[in-house]
Every structure is written in C-alpha cells, then in structure tokens.
C-alpha cells in the first residue's frame, strides 16, 4: 500500500497544477486552496463508480490531511481508476472462458466413456455367440439397407427382396422401413431359415460396433462391423 501511494504521488506531481499547489503550501498562501475543484466531490464519484469506499479514505489521507494545500485535479488519478476497473473485468472474463472450455472437455469425455462402456457390455454379454468376425468397412451413410448390404457383402436387390418378404430385423424386431438410421450397438438381421419344431430361426447378423471420427478420402464413414454368417436364435412372435 505504501509503495502504491508513493507511485501515485510521483505520478500526479508531474502535473503543473500539482507544483503550483505545493508552492502555495510552502509559502502558506491561502489563495492556493482555490486552484482546483473540490476533492470530496470527485472522490465520492470515484468511490461510487468503483464500489470501493476505501479509495476515498486513501486519497483523502494522502492529499487532504497530510498536504492540505495540494489540491490536485481529479483527472490526475482518474486514468488509474479506469485501468484498475478494466483489469478486474478482464480477469473475470478470462475465468469464465476457462470454465466454459473445461465444461466442453468434460462433456466430450463423458460421451467417450459412455461409448466405451457400451462396447464392453457387448463384449461381456454371455448370450452373444463368439462365432463372429470383425470387419473394418466404409459406408456412405448409416441407413439400415446400406449398412446391412456392406456388412454381408450382398447386393441391393437381395436386401430389397428380403425387406418385402418381412425377413429383415432391427434389434430383433421386424423392420418396417429399410431407410431407418442405425447407431452403434444396433443389430441388423437377415432371416435365412427357421425350425418350427424347435422354435428357432437362423439369421445372418451385423452389429455396428464402432464408428471412427476420421472419414475416408471419398468422405465415407469408417466403421467396424461384427458379422455372424449363421446365428441361431429363439423365434420371436412378430407383430403384423
């Protein structure tokens, strides 16, 4: 506080009015008191704007009590007050920006953790038969028919025929729209046989296991598809 007072005093003494006021104090000239505007009015304005009443006490002690004849112009310290207020606002703005970045990073990490947990659950599921193969493919979109065709390496016509025959399943439910969008964790089945006596059906299954962030040079999505060429499942009664 003492160092700040000295620096402030040194700065204001560079003004001509300050030296005139000081000369009046040394000579004891009463008229020197009328050289400048009243400090009380300015200090009230300054403390109100900055919301810091202690500034009024500080400047009053320095100039009014110790040097009563040194009546300086309020403009001598006004820039100091403005810079102080600006620095406070800048610090608050920086803190808010850092907080926003931290929140965005936290949301991305949470999303990544959810995806990892979902993949681990699929790996540990005891009901999933392990006679599968993981394939890295590239798809133009995440439409059901596009993903199934790519994963099973079959033609588009075969997918359409199976759809109209009611042989396509999405998450073990009958597919009603072949343009449905699929996501990570969805299973796509093509019915290839059934055993009415045993109450089972055989399907070719595709599981959308993973989607990479980077696309191919032709702007296709890079994915990992898990394929079962023959998977026997309990037959479910499908709604018409």
Curated annotation (Swiss-Prot):
Segments forming domain S4 RNA-binding: 142-217
Expression induction: Up-regulated upon depletion of mitochondrial nucleic acids.
FT transit peptide: 1-84
Effect of mutating residue 143 to A: Decreased RNA-binding. Does not rescue diminished mitochondrial transcription induced by EtBr
Modified residues annotated as Phosphoserine in this record: 106, 116
UniProt GO BP: regulation of mitochondrial transcription; rescue of stalled ribosome
Biased composition (Acidic residues): 116-126
GO cellular component: mitochondrial matrix; mitochondrion
Alphabetic keyword roster: Mitochondrion, Phosphoprotein, RNA-binding, Transcription, Transcription regulation, Transit peptide
Consequence of changing residue 156 to A: Decreased RNA-binding. Does not rescue diminished mitochondrial transcription induced by EtBr
Region (Disordered) residue spans: 95-127
Subcellular location(s) of the protein: Mitochondrion matrix
MF terms (GO), sorted A to Z: ribosomal large subunit binding; RNA binding; tRNA binding
Biological role stated in the UniProt entry: Mitochondrial RNA-binding protein involved in mitochondrial transcription regulation. Functions as a protective factor to maintain proper mitochondrial RNA level during stress. Acts at the transcription level and its protective function depends on its RNA binding ability. Part of a mitoribosome-associated quality control pathway that prevents aberrant translation by responding to interruptions during elongation. As heterodimer with MTRF, ejects the unfinished nascent chain and peptidyl transfer RNA (tRNA), respectively, from stalled ribosomes.
Record PANTHER family: MITOCHONDRIAL TRANSCRIPTION RESCUE FACTOR 1
Subunit structure as annotated in this protein's UniProt entry: Monomer. Interacts with POLRMT. Interacts (via S4 domain) with MTRFR (via C-terminus). Associates with mitoribosomal S39 large subunit, peptidyl tRNA and nascent chain.
Record-given protein name: Mitochondrial transcription rescue factor 1
Source organism per UniProt: Homo sapiens (Human)
């Amino acid at each position: 506080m003492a160092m700040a007072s000295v620096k402030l005093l040194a700065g204001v003494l560079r003004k001509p009015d300050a030296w005139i006021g000081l000369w009046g104090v040394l000579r004891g000239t009463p008229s020197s008191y009328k050289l400048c505007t009243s400090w009380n009015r300015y200090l009230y304005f300054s403390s109100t704007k900055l919301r810091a009443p202690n500034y009024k006490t500080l400047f009053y002690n320095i100039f009014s009590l110790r040097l009563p004849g040194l009546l300086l112009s309020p403009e001598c310290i006004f820039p100091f007050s403005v810079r102080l207020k600006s620095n406070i606002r800048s610090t608050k703005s920086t803190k808010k920006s850092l907080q926003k970045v931290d929140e965005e990073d936290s949301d991305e990490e949470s999303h990544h953790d959810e995806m990892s947990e979902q993949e681990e659950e699929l790996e540990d599921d005891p009901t999933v038969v392990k006679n599968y193969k993981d394939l890295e493919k590239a798809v133009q979109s995440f439409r059901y028919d596009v993903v199934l065709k790519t994963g099973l390496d079959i033609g588009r016509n075969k997918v359409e025929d199976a759809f109209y025959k009611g042989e396509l399943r999405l998450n073990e439910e009958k597919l009603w729209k072949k343009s449905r969008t699929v996501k990570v964790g969805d299973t796509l089945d093509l019915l290839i046989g059934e055993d009415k006596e045993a109450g089972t059906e055989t399907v070719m299954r595709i599981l959308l296991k993973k989607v990479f962030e980077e696309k191919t040079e032709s702007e296709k999505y890079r994915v990992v598809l898990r394929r079962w060429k023959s998977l026997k499942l309990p037959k479910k009664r499908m709604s018409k």
